[in-house]
UniProtKB/Swiss-Prot annotation:
Protein name: dCTP deaminase, dUMP-forming
Biased composition (Polar residues): 171-183
EC number of the protein: 3.5.4.30
Statement: the UniProt record of this protein carries the keyword Hydrolase: yes
One Pfam family this sequence matches: DCD
Subunit structure: Homotrimer.
Organism field: Pseudarthrobacter chlorophenolicus (strain ATCC 700700 / DSM 12829 / CIP 107037 / JCM 12360 / KCTC 9906 / NCIMB 13794 / A6)
Primary enzyme class: hydrolase
Amino acid sequence: MLISDRDIRAEIDSQRIVLEPFEPAMVQPSSVDVRIDKFFRLFDNHKYAHIDPAQEQPELTRLVEVEQDEAFILHPGEFVLGSTYETVTLPDDIAARLEGKSSLGRLGLLTHSTAGFIDPGFSGHVTLELSNMATLPIKLWPGMKIGQLCFFRLSSSAEFPYGQGEYGNRYQGQRGPTASRSHLNFHRTRI
């Protein structure tokens, strides 16, 4: 069940949900707004002939830090990784979903391509998969609102929350935009 602003505040007050830093004004009727950090991962397209999720490709991306009072320019058709300014910590019985801000979506900005779900037990910065679908560059200002987290109460606590090892925890405790670690649990059924 999607939880309301009242329940979100109660979960934050009891420190079952932790957003750091937290600003009470960011709470919306059924979500909490989150901001974008100053770190981005750019794809170095000339390092590899193709992207292979089965292989570690450590030079596929490079980390860029935006200077204070500067914006990151996301060009049309470009895809980069960013992250939330806030760290997010969830209890074992609450999951979250990152959604974009409609005002930014109307400008052509996508905040995630597929990975908007955050498992119960997760702790860290949420990596954003940013795409510019517009025909003009978009300025991304560190600290601006970039999305919103919606929280869902599970029917019971997860038996193996994220970070407990049973299902993997490749991104637990991540700081900033984290490159793909798909090679660590790559699975392919031969068909």
